[in-house]
Amino acid sequence: LAQLRDACALVQHVSRLVHQLQKERGLSNLYLASAAAQGAGALSDQAQAVNGSVATVRAALEAQSLNLSGGHGARLFSAIAYLLQGLDALPALRERVHAQALPVDQSTAAFVRLIAACLAVVFEAADSACDPDISRLLVAMFHFMQGKEIAGQERAAGAAAFGSGLSDVARQHHWLHLIELQDGCVQVFAEFAPASPEMRGWEDVEQNPAMAVIERLRRVACTAREGERLDAALGERWFAACTQRLDAMHRVEGHLADELVQLCERKLAIACSVLASQQVLLREEEEKEKENEKEEGEKEAEAGSVHST
C-alpha cells in the first residue's frame, strides 16, 4: 500500500505534465500551420511551463524508481525509462518546431508519443493496484486522462485545420474519429468513477459555454468541402475554447488524483492500525507463553524437591 500510495502521488505529477504538454502540442500546431503567424509568443511561454512540470516529474520518477519491486514494478520501471527518453528528446523537437523544419503531422505525432509515454506510467500504476477500491478509482482516472488526451488531440487537429486555412477531408474523418473516441472513454469513466462531486464536475464541463463554441466550430470545419477556405482567424478562437474545456477537465482530473492519494492514505492507515493491533496481540501471546513456561518450570522444580525429600 505504501508503494501504491507513492505511485498514485506520481500519477498526480504526470497528470500535470500531460496537461502542459497537450497545450504545447496545440500551440505548436497553430504556429506551424499558420507559418509562424499565430501562437509564437504563447508557445514560448508554454515551453517554460512544461519545463517546470518536467523538473517536478523527473524528481518524482527518480524517487519512485528506487522503490520498485516485483513484476508490476519492472513494467512500471520500463515505462518510466521510456518516458525519460521522450523527455530527453523534447528540446530537439522544439528546435525543429521553432525553425518550422517539420510538418504539422510530424509535430503532432511526436507529442502524441510523448504523452502516450506519460499515460503508460499511469496505466502501469493502475495495473499494480491490488486493492479493489483503489484499482477502480485508478481505472476511472486513467480513462478520464485518456479521454482528455483525445480532446487535446482534437484541439491540435482543429488548430492545424484552421491555421492552414483549407479544408481537408482526411483531417475531417480523423476529427470525427477523435470525437467518437472521447465518448468511449467518458463512458468507461462514468462506469468506474464513484458517485462524487468529481462526476458532477464532469457534467459541468460538458455544459460549459465553451462547448457551444466548440460544437459550432466543429460543424464549420467538418462540413466544409475539400479544399474550401477556412477562416484562419478562427484558429485562435478554437484554441481558446478547447483550452477552457481542457482546463476544466484538468480540474476534474486533479480532484480525482487528490481523492486517489487520500484513499491510499486511508487504506494505509487502516492497514497500519490492524498490523499494530496484531503485533500487540502477538506480544501478549508471547508473554503468556513465557509465563506458562515459567510456571511449568517452577512446578517441575517443586515436584523434584518433594521427590528428593
Residue spans for each PLM region:
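Hydrophobic alpha-helical segments
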Residues: 1-309
